Amino acid sequence: MRLERLRIRGLRCLAEADIELGEGIHVFVGANGAGKTSVLEAAFLLSHGRSFRSGGAKEVLLQRGASSLSVFGEIRHQDGRIGRVGLGREGARWDARLDGRSASLGEVVSECAVVCFEPGSHALIAGGAEERRRYLDWGVFHVEHEFLLAWRRYQRALKQRNSLLRSNSPVAPELFLSWEAELSQTGERIHFMRVRYLDQLLPHLEQTIGGLLPELGAIELRYRRGWPEERDLAEVLADQRDRDLSRGHTTQGVHRAEWSISFEHAPMREHLSRGQEKLTALGCLLAQAALFASQKGEWPVVCLDDLASELDLAHQTAVVGQLAGVGAQVLVTGTELPAPLQSLSAHVFHVEQGKVAAPAIITS
């Protein structure tokens, strides 16, 4: 798939931008603070319903002085189908639109797939479990049609159980039973889909991370589902009810799951350098994109923010060459044109003080 048009209004320092995109590599060049990362952020918003940057709250996303923001994308799929997606915000909630009609956020993000490597991506490896669950569930969402409904049912039951746990008055035990049964049923389904996804992801991880970090040896994926193996979640929740009452929240379930990567020559995360964490995270994102392509028949849009600052020249060249070779649409930012792109065909946009100039086309 590729974004053919990206229209942005009121996002950070971008007052108004209407960007036409084509195939292949697109580079947004400008000084720090010019607004080039916000272009990638807009594409990511359409795919994830949130920002990849810290400070992604609505009031921070808004351009200073603006009361609303909107992002519109026109997406061409491999089969020629064109989807038009939009997200707007004026108040507390996102307003989502798909092909001109009101839609759920889930419908919009299912239409647009974007993966992004950026300065904070190392948190996928070095950060908390929530970041890794987000990565995992985004991938599962795009390949398992049942996932979104199961996830919504699970979240509703979790919210209801937590509400009972925080009640100021005593709660009859039988009031917990229906919500715990729902958590167990939907949690088992989510767990099964996650495990199946990780099994499918592993060969792609071996290829991408093995190419980026061959010195670390063989890769192993570890997954903990969030409650003890061989036990029914409903039984665990019943057993843990008193403990959860004292804490005011549900401490077991798929919302507590964790997965990690270990290496033959770096069995613990602490054995990785900061640079190796970044390359491992990059490998995870490229593997996820490759799995998406193998199952959907088209590559997601790949964003590489501040490429030259995040990767050395050899890894820049390898990644850009790989993505160009498979025909992915790639959006790159930098304070100048990254060296590996100078020998490739690319659309180069100059970004200055929140304005995006029409592209110059560099041909190899």
Q: What label would you give each PLM region?
A:
Residues A123-L124, E130-L177, A181:
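Long, charged N-terminal accessory/stalk domains
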Residues M1-A31, V171-Q185, R189-V301, E310-Q329, ...:
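Conserved NTPase motor "head" modules and their coupling/switch loops across ABC/AAA+ ATPases, GTPases
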Residues D305-L307:
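Walker B catalytic acidic pair
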Residues H48-E131, Y135-F147, D199-Q207, A238-D242:
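Nucleotide-state sensing region of NTPase/ATPase domains
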Residues L45-A57, A287-Q295:
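Post-Walker A helix-loop "phosphate-sensing" segment adjacent to the P-loop in P-loop NTPases
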Residues K36:
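Conserved lysine of the Walker
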